[in-house]
Amino acid sequence: MLQTLHDYFWWERLWLPVNLTWADLEDRDGRVYAKASDLYITLPLALLFLIIRYFFELYVATPLAALLNVKEKTRLRAPPNPTLEHFYMTSGKQPKQADVELLSRQSGLSGRQVERWFRRRRNQDRPSLLKKFREASWRFTFYLIAFIAGTAVIVDKPWFYDLRKVWEGYPIQSIIPSQYWYYMIELSFYWSLLFSIASDVKRKDFKEQIIHHVATIILISFSWFANYVRAGTLIMALHDSSDYLLESAKMFNYAGWKNTCNNIFIVFAIVFIITRLVILPFWILHCTLVYPLELYPAFFGYYFFNFMMGVLQLLHIFWAYLILRMAHKFITGKVVEDERSDREETESSEGEEAAAGGGAKNRPLANGHPILNNNHRKND
């Protein structure tokens, strides 16, 4: 049965155009072709990426955070309370009013004290500013290097300037070492992101991020199997062109350099819109949808590849919506922040006031303490 499944999965009609077989893609005469077995190396490379990331965050990102004066807000910890902790872990982090009243009776605390306990407990679970900075630093470093390397891989190729040449001679297209390593490194990195997603900073688009990583891994793997390598290198470089800008904007945001963050974010938004909503659908997708049909009839691989490209395009539209919302806030003078991030709650949430007298009563609050001077912003 397993052999039958294996034979059906690797049936040439699924992966290759009509009248072509895997034998046509065997290495010969010094020409090397993409093979599925090449991708086995990406899993150990993904683990290597996780190790490199650990040491990078420890010995590079952490000192950089100190240099940029990335500071944590003081968080008041929720006092131990078995009753409230049990509810928090088993029933939910946001108790309804009826739950608050019940927990108040069970714990002997007032309703206001129960609400305060849950706010502090939720804040404890939120990732620290340093964790966010280190994660953004790692991704910025990879995406920047990947974009530079990817550009070097494709800039001297004829299909970079004439998309019809992407399919010239397809699928009998040999690969060169630079294409091989570009693919292996990109795929390994996305495997590492998928492996670490449970421990990384969780944002509101957590599910969309999982879909994106899975779709990207499938697309990169399939494009290698089916020898869509030329199209694949163009797509990967296009995606890397804006990602490093977003991560650098996050880094400056966490460091408190708001003007620099906002300026980089505007550049990122422009690059994202141009690459993901203009170049990708009207050039790259047109290239993968229209030009192949001029050479051979559509087959399963053709439909599958373009379907996955459509999934990515829908995610781009979703993220473009979030980006435009943030850009609108910037233009209208509001603070620009990551729309996907949860906001940290303060002790004054839901109208609660700190127990402080005199003029401090009406001052801004941070974790329940009046802020004496809230104007320490870096001047870029």
Curated annotation (Swiss-Prot):
Lumenal side, ranges: 1-40
Short sequence motif Last loop motif: positions: 291-300
Residues carrying Phosphoserine: 341, 348-349
Superkingdom: Eukaryota
Topological domains annotated Cytoplasmic: 325-380
Positions glycosylated per UniProt: 19
Annotated localization: Endoplasmic reticulum membrane
Reaction equation(s) it catalyzes: a very long-chain fatty acyl-CoA + a sphingoid base = an N-(very-long-chain fatty acyl)-sphingoid base + CoA + H(+); docosanoyl-CoA + sphinganine = N-docosanoylsphinganine + CoA + H(+); tetracosanoyl-CoA + sphinganine = N-tetracosanoylsphinganine + CoA + H(+); hexacosanoyl-CoA + sphinganine = N-hexacosanoylsphinganine + CoA + H(+)
EC number: 2.3.1.24, 2.3.1.297
Domain TLC: 131-332
Compositional bias segments (type: Acidic residues): 344-353
Enzyme class name: transferase
Reported modifications of this chain: Acetylated. Deacetylation by SIRT3 increases enzyme activity and promotes mitochondrial ceramide accumulation.
GO CC terms of this entry: endoplasmic reticulum; endoplasmic reticulum membrane
Chief location: endoplasmic reticulum
Residue segments, region Disordered: 338-380
Membrane topology recorded in Swiss-Prot or TrEMBL: Multi-pass membrane protein
Regulation acting on activity, per entry: Ceramide synthase activity is inhibited by sphingosine-1-phosphate.
Function, as annotated: Ceramide synthase that catalyzes the transfer of the acyl chain from acyl-CoA to a sphingoid base, with high selectivity toward very-long-chain fatty acyl-CoA (chain length C22-C27). N-acylates sphinganine and sphingosine bases to form dihydroceramides and ceramides in de novo synthesis and salvage pathways, respectively. Plays a non-redundant role in the synthesis of ceramides with very-long-chain fatty acids in kidney, liver and brain. Regulates the abundance of myelin-specific sphingolipids galactosylceramide and sulfatide that affects myelin sheath architecture and motor neuron functions.
Quaternary organization: Interacts with ATP6V0C, ASGR1, ASGR2 and SLC22A1/OCT1. Interacts with ELOV1, HSD17B12 and TECR. Interacts with NDUFS2.
UniProt-listed PANTHER family: CERAMIDE SYNTHASE 2, LONGEVITY ASSURANCE FACTOR 1 LAG1
Name this protein carries in UniProt: Ceramide synthase 2
Species in which this protein is naturally found: Bos taurus
